[in-house]
Each structure stands twice: as C-alpha cells, then as structure tokens.
Amino acid sequence: MQLVNTRYAEALIDVTEEKNSTDKVLNNLVQVLKLLEENREFYSFLLDPQIQKESRKEAIIKVFEGRIEQEVVNFLMLLVDKERFENIRGIVEEYFRLADERKNILNMTIISAFPLEDVQINRIKEKYKKLYNKTDVKAKLIIDKSLIGGVKIQIGDKVIDDSIKGRLLCLKEALLQR
C-alpha cells in the first residue's frame, strides 16, 4: 500500500513542481481532506465502486473545479479512475513528506515524558538541523509519561532513544547478558 501511495504522490509532486504550484497544492489537499472528513457521505460516494466512475468524477468537478488547482481536480479524478480513492489520506501524507524532503526540511517527532519549553524544542531542532544538514526542521511533540525522563527522537524509521526508560532497558539487557 505504501508503494502505491509513494508512486501517486511522486507523480503529483512532479507535476506541481513543473508548474511551480507545490505550496498551493499542499493547501488544496488540506482543504480536500477537511471536506472529506466533514462530509462522510460525499467521501463514501467517491469510494463506492457501485456508482459509475463518470458520476463520481462529475461530482468532483461540481464540488472542486474553480475552487482548487486544476492539477488537484485532475488528480482526484485519476484516483476515481484507478479505484484508488481509498488511498487519498496516505497519498497526501506522502506528498507532504516528499514536498518537505525536496525543500530540504527535516520532519521529526520529539517524544518526551513532560512538556518541553520552546527553548528546549528549538535546541533539539537546531541540533538535528545541523546534524542532517537541513534548511529547516518541523517537529511534533508527543508526551509519553512512561519514558520517566529524557526524550526519544524519531526521524523517519530511525529512533534515537535518550530516555530514562530506554537507558534502564539497555542496562537490563546488559545485566542479563552477563
């Protein structure tokens, strides 16, 4: 499923970069997801394979044409044509990731036992910005009291565990191996 999301997201970002409309399309995709979330009946209609593709595409045109970039309208219709509309959320998430990657932006999750102050978050962001040689860093903060203290940093599939819980687990493993 992830491969499908990546392929569609790459195709869309290639088109939007050519037309210099990546940021507009990012905003449009947020609007589309919001509308689909708020109007579950419309979303179900677009997913329903029992309804003719032409009817679903006409609905997309009526709702979106003139309100969002034409590339996004065409993209939504392509998803209907290929019966991939159920992948829209994953494709949009992958599009956002690719857009950030191409802008040299690092996305990270900071997992902490307690809320961090802005100064602490900025220090962490700056450290990883330099470490990964990125122009900017976007960070999401998650509170997980089970860490006891310290932080875990997640960047893509990589996790850097500098939490007390992580240190205790390492110590436990070391003691068990003796």
UniProtKB/Swiss-Prot annotation:
GO MF term set: proton-transporting ATP synthase activity, rotational mechanism
Matches recorded under Pfam families: OSCP
GO cellular component: plasma membrane; proton-transporting ATP synthase complex
Disulfide bridge map: none
Membrane topology: Peripheral membrane protein
Keyword check for Isomerase: no
Keywords per UniProt: ATP synthesis, Cell membrane, CF(1), Hydrogen ion transport, Ion transport, Membrane, Transport
Places the protein is found: Cell membrane
InterPro entries in the record: ATP_synth_OSCP/delta_N_sf, ATPase_OSCP/dsu
Family from the record: Belongs to the ATPase delta chain family.
General function of this protein: F(1)F(0) ATP synthase produces ATP from ADP in the presence of a proton or sodium gradient. F-type ATPases consist of two structural domains, F(1) containing the extramembraneous catalytic core and F(0) containing the membrane proton channel, linked together by a central stalk and a peripheral stalk. During catalysis, ATP synthesis in the catalytic domain of F(1) is coupled via a rotary mechanism of the central stalk subunits to proton translocation.
Oligomeric form and interacting partners: F-type ATPases have 2 components, F(1) - the catalytic core - and F(0) - the membrane proton channel. F(1) has five subunits: alpha(3), beta(3), gamma(1), delta(1), epsilon(1). F(0) has three main subunits: a(1), b(2) and c(10-14). The alpha and beta chains form an alternating ring which encloses part of the gamma chain. F(1) is attached to F(0) by a central stalk formed by the gamma and epsilon chains, while a peripheral stalk is formed by the delta and b chains.
This protein's name: ATP synthase subunit delta
Gene source species: Acetivibrio thermocellus (strain ATCC 27405 / DSM 1237 / JCM 9322 / NBRC 103400 / NCIMB 10682 / NRRL B-4536 / VPI 7372)
Gene (UniProt): atpH
